[in-house]
A protein has these predicted regions:
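Conserved phosphate- and dinucleotide-binding cores of soluble alpha/beta proteins
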Residues: 1-277
Length: 277
């Protein structure tokens, strides 16, 4: 078990019982990036400047973004989850935290899962601090980082900008985690950028993730009032401050080409563009 620094200690006097366990820690090994992941990773990376402070999760989307940041400088990290994808950027000197305006020079995280290498890396590492989620995920603490870029995934986005990230229809797929906290914190940050990133399709290209309306019973994690940037392998849609008509147009443009015509007709039917002609 790695010994992590920060605010994660409990004095032994607070424990009623202590049981030693010697089984190996659970690990997670990142897979190879797909061409689609590499493409939208490049689009997201284009929104990240030198000195930005990042929040990322785990899996193909964050790893794809990190793969295109090797030429950046003084990147900071304030994130709910600390994962393997960050290790290479730290070794390359890309992640320094030197320009952070909140906990400068430190990586702030809430929890971690990854490889044995990751666990060895964070053990007694004074550059990495773990804190309770009510501190890490506090939108006002997140906003204290200038140029905060929050990158979160989605299952569906409708043509008005509502983001579903936790359910497939009425069936719960995962927890919503800290997505709303970080999207709002990044929005309040000076120079901050909230990003929703996802592949344009699912089920091998048979289903569009950009939809006229969310599936019946689907949960809205990031509301249309909180959404800013939506990214797929087909481009970047900037939605914040735009009317519903312009949002729908921007989202159709980053949908998979085989679904664009049907999405346009659905937008007309919903009167997002005006009457159906």
């Amino acid at each position: 078990m790695p010994r992590t620094l920060g605010n994660g200690f409990i004095h032994v006097s607070k424990l009623d019982a202590c049981i030693e366990v010697d089984r190996p820690l659970d690990t997670y090994s990142p897979g190879s990036l797909t061409d689609i992941e590499k493409t939208f990773g490049k689009h997201v990376a284009g929104l990240i400047d030198d000195g930005a402070c990042l929040q990322l999760g785990i899996g193909g989307i964050p790893d794809a973004v990190l793969d295109f940041l090797h030429d950046r400088k003084d990147i900071g990290i304030h994130t709910e989850m600390f994962s393997d994808g960050l290790l290479e950027l730290m070794d390359r000197g890309v992640v320094t935290g030197d320009r952070k305006t909140f906990h400068p020079g430190k990586i702030i995280a809430g929890f971690t899962i990854g490889s044995e290498k990751l666990y060895d890396y964070i053990h007694d590492n004074a550059l990495i601090e773990f804190h309770p989620s009510d501190y890490v995920n506090d939108p006002f603490n997140i906003a204290r980082n200038d140029n905060m870029v929050a990158i979160n995934s989605a299952l569906q986005v409708d043509l008005t900008g509502q983001v579903c990230a936790d359910s497939i229809g009425a069936y719960i797929y995962s927890g919503f985690g800290g997505q709303v906290d970080f999207m709002r914190g990044a929005a309040m940050s000076k120079g901050g950028i909230p990003v929703t990133a996802m592949p344009a399709t699912a089920v091998g290209g048979e289903v569009s993730r950009i939809v006229p309306m969310l599936n019946e019973g689907a949960g809205v994690v990031t509301s249309r009032a909180d959404v800013h940037y939506v990214v797929t392998e087909y481009g970047v849609a900037q939605l914040h401050g735009k009317c519903v008509r312009d949002r729908a147009k921007a989202l159709v443009e980053i949908a998979a080409p085989q679904f664009q015509e049907s999405l346009l007709r659905a937008a007309h039917k919903r009167r997002l563009f005006g009457p159906l002609i």
